[in-house]
Every structure is written in C-alpha cells, then in structure tokens.
C-alpha cells in the first residue's frame, strides 16, 4: 500500500493492523490494508494528502470519501465562483464611452457579486437603425452609404471604441454586415418584419462587444454572448416574440457550463432571441432587455435581478408629466406587471413573469445615482397601510361601445365579440360590461406599428355591426390607479371628488381581476391634467392617516 500511494506523492500514515481486512480501490490506485476502521483511515489520509483529493471506494458498503486539506477554503472558493445576480443596463446607461466606463466601475464596485451583465443598444441606436431601414427601401443600392443614420451609427460606435481604448475590429464585421443588409433592403425595396428584427439586432450586438472588450482591457475577464446563440428560444412573431419554456434549460446549460470552465463575466445582448421554427433573429418588443434579464435570472436560479435605469426606481407617476413624482420603495410582482402593462416605461410588461415564477427579487436602480435605494419588487409586501402605489397613463387608446339587446339572457355573445378581435389580431386592454352593452379599449402597442390601422378598425366595426350597434371613439387615454384595491371605496371616492373638482368626465371604469388596478378612461387632452390632480391628492397629502381614521365598516365595504 505504502509503495502504491507513495508513487502518487502521498506520504502514507501509520495504520492500525488489528481489524478485519477491507479492500480499497480508486482510479489508478489499488491497495489493501488491515485497518481499524474506514473513518480512522480517512482522517489519517486527509492529514497526509494535504491538497490531494482521493476518492476512496469501500467495496464493503460502497462508502465514497472525498478529502481535502482545507475544506472551508474550498467551500469559500466555490461560493465566490458562483454567478450571483443579473445586472441589466438600458440604452441611456451605455449611451457613450464615458457611460460604459462608469457602468464598468459600478459593476466592479460590488466585489462580492459575480453578475451576468445584460445590455441594451447604445441610446438612439435602435431608432436610427429603423430609420435607416426605412430610407434604404427607397434610396437605391448605390445610395445606401449616404444614409445619414448609417453614418451616425458607424461614427458613434467607432468613436466609442477609440475612447474606450479597444480595437475597432470587435465591431468591424457588424458594421460591414449592417451596410450589406441595408443594400439588400434597398435591392428588394421592402423591409419585412423579419428583416426589421435582424436589422435592429446590430445595436445590441455591437454595444455588448464594445463593453466586453473594455472589461478585458482593464483586466477583468469577460465574454460576449448573443442571446440568440445561448438558447433564448422564441416564437416566430417578429418584432414582438414570446420566450418559450425550452429557453430555461438551454440558457442554464450554456452559461453555467462556460462559467465553470473559464470564469469569464458573461455580457449578454438584451432584447433578442431566436425563432424556434425559422431560427431567425427575433426581438421581444420595446424594453425587451428587461425580459431577457429576468429570463436569465430564472434560468440560472440567481439571488437577485437588478435593472439599472436612468431614474431612481419605479416612480409614483411619469416624471415627464409631473415633476413631483416620487420613488416607490416596494412593489409586488402583480403591481409591477400592471404598471408596466398600462404604460410605465421603466419595465417591460412581461418581465415580471419569470421573476415571479422563480421567486427572485427584482431591484430597479439608477445607474446615474447608484446610491439611491431604488425599488425592490417581491412576491408580497406589507399592504396594511398601502393605498395608492402609482398612477400610470397610456395614451392614444381606441375605445369601443358595443350595445345589443341580444345580450339579455343569452350566452355566447361575448365569445362572438372576442372571436372578432382574435381573427383580426387585435389585443383588448380594458373591458366593462352591463346587461346590454360592452365597453372596451384596444391596445395601441399591438397594432400601432402596422400599416392600414384605420382599415383594421373599419373591419372591426363592420364585423361587430352584424350583431350589435357599435360606437368607435378615438383619442382616449387610460389612467390606471395601481395599489391596494381592498381600499377601492376610499380610492374611488377621493379620486372622483378630485376629478369632479377639475371638471374631468370619466367615460369608463374597470377594476382588474388582479386586485391591484382600477382603470379610468378619459379624453386624451384631459389626461395629463388628470394625472397631476390625482397625484397631488394621493401622494402630497396624508392619505394613509386619512384611511386609518375611516370607520372600520367603511374600509370593510371596499374589499
């Protein structure tokens, strides 16, 4: 035995030879000895082996032992190497070389974190790419290199590379590919939805390559990944694809596998995926980088998902509408999803689902003000004193009033109405019904980028007029009151008093099944004034104290 173990550089311990004979074997190592017990032998081997790990198999009992000199240090190193969180940065956070340098400093200021970094395209790049595509349709192949937006994109990214001190070679292939794609669009004289998705993907592909190259330059090992190459698998709904369940195991296998081999910080493109049938590049809709971040967080089972924006977290209303907007310290996933869906630009509407399913907290922070506490989004929070969390405005909404006496005592009427929308591919936002009528709003984000909008609306009216009287109302806005709807009586009483005082007429009201949202429909030209008045009433007075002073029966009646 001693000879066998010494062959591997192990100083053998003294063994007691007064017990039964046990046969031991390991890969490349065979020996037998008389020992008092496997446990005593293992301790002795541990002291002798130092940093050498031995896997010892006892044929009598099949006991496997893995011994190391410093087990605590080993455990610590294992913890340090584990990916801990996702850090997602939007376009304004990486808008220039200066901003990228600040983001790198921010990431490295958390030495205990081993993040997956998700980046959007540099600010304005996506819009410039789309404008370049539209111009390429009619400019002719020979004039593509004169497109102003193409020149802007080239100059921005080359300048950024120089200012970061990295080689322009990291983006040269993509700049060349972008120009060739635009020439193809010019030759075909059309920009399909599939081509549009491929076109805008160049923004994220270049920003992540520049950022990863900079991290490597300053001595922090990083590796760039295109989301469509690491397993983000989507439907083939170009410009607004949905992520499929097959994504999670694929992403986990790729990122964790690479991380275990090289410990390079992953820098991943947001917003992008790969169609499961077409294998073409798809996009997740505007703001889709948030969804990329939460999807990766769930796939890897990380501790936290951080979404870094240019505002101090989720606010009580849009600061562009009212400068008195305040940060919201805590939200539930349900509240955040409603906020995003009804117009809050700080989060993608679908981004909360993976986080909720994985029960992973989402923290919204300001990359321009990293010391601000931001907003923490979790499954639940203390709602005992909560009244209103935020006020959200969605403009340019179309409203339909559908009236028919056929609804009385009949079944299947609503099914006929909604099958019409399904057939035409139009999404419904808010619904309210009575005995003989339905009022609903149409989601502008689902069809505002498509041509023939009026034609589609005319089709809706034509189909519905076969079964009802239809009134189409344009230029409406949805004002959503997100909060504790168990306080709905108080919220509505106070809200309608404010609106009546300001002469604003509510044309429709709906309380969502989510129990965190009350939606009001008003005219577009009254919407901003409405938000300001409601914000002043709910957030600039002691609303919580007023609620606590209400009679118990009054509160109970609202639940």
UniProtKB/Swiss-Prot annotation:
For this UniProt entry, the molecular function terms from Gene Ontology, in alphabetical order, are:
aspartate kinase activity; ATP binding
Transit peptide residues are 1-85
Q: Where in the cell is it found?
A: Plastid, Chloroplast
Chain positions recorded as substrate binding sites: 204
Q: What is its main location?
A: plastid
The domain of life is: Eukaryota
Identify the tissues in which this protein is expressed. Highly expressed in xylem of leaves and hypocotyls, stele of roots and in trichomes after bolting. Weak expression in veins and mesophyll cells of caulone leaves, inflorescence stems, sepals, petals and stigmata.
A Pfam family (short name) is: ACT_9
Activity modulation notes: Allosterically inhibited by lysine, but not by S-adenosyl-L-methionine (SAM). K(0.5) for lysine in the presence of physiological concentrations of substrates is 7.4 uM. No inhibition by threonine or leucine and no activation or inhibition by alanine, cysteine, isoleucine, serine, valine, methionine, glutamine, asparagine, glutamic acid or arginine.
Q: What are the residue boundaries of the ACT domain, all occurrences included? A: 402-480, 481-559
- What EC numbers are recorded for this enzyme? 2.7.2.4
Q: Which keywords does UniProt give here?
A: Amino-acid biosynthesis, ATP-binding, Chloroplast, Kinase, Nucleotide-binding, Plastid, Repeat, Threonine biosynthesis, Transferase, Transit peptide
Its annotated pathway reads: Amino-acid biosynthesis; L-lysine biosynthesis via DAP pathway; (S)-tetrahydrodipicolinate from L-aspartate: step 1/4; Amino-acid biosynthesis; L-methionine biosynthesis via de novo pathway; L-homoserine from L-aspartate: step 1/3; Amino-acid biosynthesis; L-threonine biosynthesis; L-threonine from L-aspartate: step 1/5
For this protein, the record's InterPro entries field holds: AceGlu_kinase-like_sf, ACT-like_dom_sf, ACT_Aspartokinase, ACT_dom, Asp/Glu/Uridylate_kinase, Asp_kinase, AsparK_Bifunc_asparK/hSer_DH, Aspartate_kinase_CS
User: Quick one: a GO biological-process term for this protein?
Assistant: threonine biosynthetic process
> What is the reaction catalyzed?
L-aspartate + ATP = 4-phospho-L-aspartate + ADP
User: Which cellular component terms (GO) are annotated to the entry?
Assistant: chloroplast
* Binding positions (ATP): 88, 91, 120
What the protein does comes down to:
Involved in the first step of essential amino acids lysine, threonine, methionine and isoleucine synthesis via the aspartate-family pathway.
| Record-stated family | Belongs to the aspartokinase family.
Protein name, UniProt field = Aspartokinase 3, chloroplastic
Its gene?
AK3
């Amino acid at each position: 035995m001693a000879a066998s173990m010494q062959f591997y550089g192990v100083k053998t311990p003294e063994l007691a030879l007064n017990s039964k004979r046990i046969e031991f074997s390991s890969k490349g190592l065979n020996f037998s000895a008389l020992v008092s017990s496997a446990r005593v032998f293992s301790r002795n081997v541990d002291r002798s082996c130092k940093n050498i790990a031995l896997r010892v198999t006892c044929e009598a009992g099949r006991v496997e032992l893995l011994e190391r000199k410093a087990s605590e240090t080993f455990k610590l190193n294992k913890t340090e190497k584990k990916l801990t969180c996702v850090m997602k940065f939007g376009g304004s956070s990486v808008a220039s070389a200066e901003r990228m340098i600040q983001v790198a400093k921010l990431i490295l200021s958390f030495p205990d974190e081993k993040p997956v970094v998700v980046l959007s395209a540099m600010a304005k790049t996506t819009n410039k790419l789309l404008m370049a595509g539209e111009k390429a349709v009619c400019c002719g192949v020979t004039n593509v290199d004169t497109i102003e937006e193409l020149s802007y994109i080239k100059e921005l990214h080359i300048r950024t590379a120089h200012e970061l001190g990295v080689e322009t070679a990291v983006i040269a292939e993509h700049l060349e590919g972008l120009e060739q794609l635009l020439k193809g669009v010019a030759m075909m004289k059309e920009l399909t939805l599939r081509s549009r998705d491929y076109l805008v993907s160049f923004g994220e592909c270049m920003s992540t390559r520049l950022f990863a190259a900079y991290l490597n330059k300053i001595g922090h090992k990083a590796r760039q990944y295109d989301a469509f190459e690491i397993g983000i698998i989507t439907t083939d709904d170009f410009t607004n694809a949905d992520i499929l369940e097959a994504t999670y195991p694929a992403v986990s296998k790729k990122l964790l596998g690479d991380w275990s081999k090289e410990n390079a910080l992953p820098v991943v493109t947001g917003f992008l995926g790969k169609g499961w049938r077409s294998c073409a590049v798809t996009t997740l809709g505007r703001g889709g980088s948030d969804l990329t971040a939460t999807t990766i967080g769930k796939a890897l089972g990380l501790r936290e998902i951080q979404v870094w924006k240019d505002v101090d977290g989720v606010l009580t209303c849009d600061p562009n509408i009212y400068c008195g907007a305040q940060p919201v310290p805590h939200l539930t996933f349900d509240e955040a999803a409603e906020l995003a869906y009804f117009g809050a630009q700080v989060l993608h509407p679908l981004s909360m689902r993976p986080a909720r399913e994985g029960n992973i907290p989402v923290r919204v922070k300001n990359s321009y003000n990293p010391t601000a506490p931001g907003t923490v989004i979790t499954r639940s929070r203390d709602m005992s004193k909560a009244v209103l969390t935020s006020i959200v405005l969605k403009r340019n909404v179309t409203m339909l009033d559908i009236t028919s006496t056929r609804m009385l005592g009949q079944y299947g009427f609503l099914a006929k109405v909604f099958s019409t929308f399904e057939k035409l591919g139009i999404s419904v936002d808010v619904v309210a019904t009575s005995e003989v009528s339905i009022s609903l709003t149409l989601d502008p984000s689902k069809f505002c980028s498509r041509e023939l909008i009026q034609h589609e609306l005319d089709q809706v009216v034509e189909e519905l007029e076969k079964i009802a009287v239809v009134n189409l109302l344009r230029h409406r806005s949805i004002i959503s009151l997100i909060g504790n709807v168990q306080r709905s009586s108080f919220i509505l009483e106070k809200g309608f008093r404010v609106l009546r005082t300001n002469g604003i007429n509510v044309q429709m009201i709906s309380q969502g099944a989510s129990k965190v949202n009350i939606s009001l429909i008003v005219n577009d030209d009254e919407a901003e004034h409405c938000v300001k008045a409601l914000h002043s009433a709910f957030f600039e007075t002691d609303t919580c104290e007023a609620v606590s002073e209400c009679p118990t029966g009054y509160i109970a009646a609202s639940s």
